[in-house]
Amino acid sequence: VLTGLDNRLKNAPPEDWARITILVNTQRMARRLRELFDLGPPRFLPKIQMLTDLDNFLPDGPSPPSMSGLKRRLELVSLITKLIESQPDIAAQSSCFDLADSLANLIDEMQGEAVTPEDIARLDITDQSGHWARTQQFISIAQKYISAAKSAPDPTARQRENVLKLQAHWIKNPPPHPILLVGSTGSRGTTQLLMQNIATLPQGAVILPGFDFSMPRQVWNQMMGTFTGEDHPQ
């Protein structure tokens, strides 16, 4: 990343470095980039921030703070406890916290991929009807939680809301300065959406990790199918 910026900015005014924003997906990468910049030569530094920290891009200011993980866990425990009390055969009372953690992970995945409880309820699982009926009862808890948490969304839901706001804003008002998203593979739906948005900006770029620049075009073309490319390292 640093080498590429050096090559592109070698004849640019020094203040152009300060106009660049670099979004990274881990604190470790942010620290490493800062360490490399600290090695010199002296220059203005770009802004380096986490891709989950998008508040400074939002046109209307920061979104409301997200719900804490502990509060979410306790709310899910409360909902699961009520379900178990009404149907004691569904699970042991001692499993409430484990079930809450599993349900929290499911909710994160649903919100990150924009999957609603209604989408899951419509799945046709005819060969596992008994197990599926129990699963749907827990899905109903997720539905209650998501509906009740709209005023104070958890971090995953808040991030998706921010990305959707930026998508709408950037269509009409693209940022006047370069934005680079570095090091993410887009394995999460919300991050992938952010990457797509940045890649379409006039001064946006997405830098993928481990990209094979020597791979022939025909191999890339073979990976276009949903199933033919899913196991390929690229």
Task: Show where each model-derived region lies.
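Conserved P-loop NTPase "ATPase switch" module shared by AAA+ and STAND
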Residues: 175-187
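Basic/charged alpha-beta structural segments of nucleotide/phosphate-handling enzymes
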Residues: 24-174, 189, 196, 202, ...
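Short, glycine/acidic-rich beta->alpha junctions
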Residues: 14, 186-190
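Residue-level signal for alpha-helix termini/capping positions
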Residues: 10-14, 171, 199
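Glycine-rich P-loop/Walker A and Walker A-like loops and their local beta1-loop-alpha1 context
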Residues: 1-33
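A general structural motif
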Residues: 17-19, 174-178, 201-203
